[in-house]
A protein has these predicted regions:
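Conserved alpha/beta-hydrolase
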Residues: 56-78
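Catalytic nucleophile-loop/oxyanion-hole region of alpha/beta-hydrolase
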Residues: 75-104
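The serine-hydrolase catalytic nucleophile loop
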Residues: 44-56, 71
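Short beta-strand element of the alpha/beta-hydrolase
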Residues: 33-42
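Glycine-rich nucleophile elbow surrounding the catalytic serine of serine-hydrolase chemistry
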Residues: 113-123
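The alpha/beta-hydrolase serine catalytic core
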Residues: 20, 119, 126, 131-217, ...
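Alpha/beta-hydrolase fold nucleophile elbow
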Residues: 104-115
Length: 256
């Protein structure tokens, strides 16, 4: 980007022909070297959601560049929502990490993700454990594979050995049964056990989508993890987003 580096840059990152909509936001001053945080939204979400942009701006304010990405089938990226799977999101994440590694100003790389994005960064972080300096899963939905194996997901019950061709997402859109079949094969516990670098988990204790017990269990299982519970808050932090931002700011300040 040169000496007059742009404060914000919109781009497409291509993952095997699929264009992923992305925005790079720089701290002040934009020039020089900076650590970077990749920020990933959740299921049915996008990178312009209130909690996603607020986390990115908080990180920009303490010297981090941020790279927000719309994942496969979400936001303004390619792909149909109904055809997205956790494998596709995971390969998206790995591609974005590789893109970030190629940016000449980047020193360290961190991953932050909300809900399904939180589980995605848990998986990608384990695969790139020698590259990623820290993880911030926000209300991570790592119960998805367990629900897929048990036959209860998205508020629906089904035979896990005979997965239906289509399911309904909570916003009314349909979801291909392959989403469930892929999820059944994933063991997030293995990813947690492989990751030894510092982790911050933030979770509302009245989360209506991902029970807070999953955040607590993941924090206990990680070798180096700080857990911050937000009293009385929901999955998307409708009541106390400021406390989430405070937790992220405190944990990340001075880390790179």
């Amino acid at each position: 980007m040169g000496e007059e580096r742009e404060k914000m840059k919109q781009m497409y990152i291509t993952d095997d022909g699929i264009r992923l909509n992305a925005k790079l936001d720089m701290p002040e001053p934009a020039e020089g070297k900076h650590p970077l945080v990749i920020v990933i939204h959740g299921f049915t979400g996008h990178m312009e959601e209130r909690h996603i942009t607020a986390v990115a701006k908080t990180l920009n304010g303490i010297g981090y560049a941020t790279l927000r990405v719309d994942m496969y089938g979400h936001g303004n990226s390619d792909g149909k929502f109904e055809n997205h799977t956790l494998y596709k999101w995971l390969t998206n994440a790995l591609t974005v990490i590789d893109y970030a590694r190629g940016l000449d100003f980047v020193t360290d790389i961190y991953l932050c993700g909300h809900s399904q994005g939180g589980m995605t960064v848990m998986l990608a972080g384990a695969m790139k454990h020698d590259v990623i300096k820290g993880l911030i899963p926000l209300s991570p939905a790592w119960m998805i594979p367990e629900g897929a194996r048990k036959g209860t997901l998205l508020g629906q019950d089904f035979d896990p050995d005979h997965v239906p061709d289509l399911l309904a997402a909570w916003d009314g859109r349909t979801l291909n049964g392959n989403y469930v079949r892929v999820a059944q094969t994933i063991r997030v516990e293995d990813a947690i056990d492989r990751y030894t670098v510092p982790v911050l988990i933030v979770h509302g204790d009245e989360d209506e989508a991902v029970p807070v017990e999953y955040g607590i269990e993941a924090a206990k299982r990680y070798r180096d993890c700080k857990l911050v519970l937000i009293p009385g808050d929901t999955h998307c932090y409708d009541h106390h987003l400021d406390q989430v931002l405070d937790a992220v700011r405190e944990w990340m300040t001075g880390r790179s």
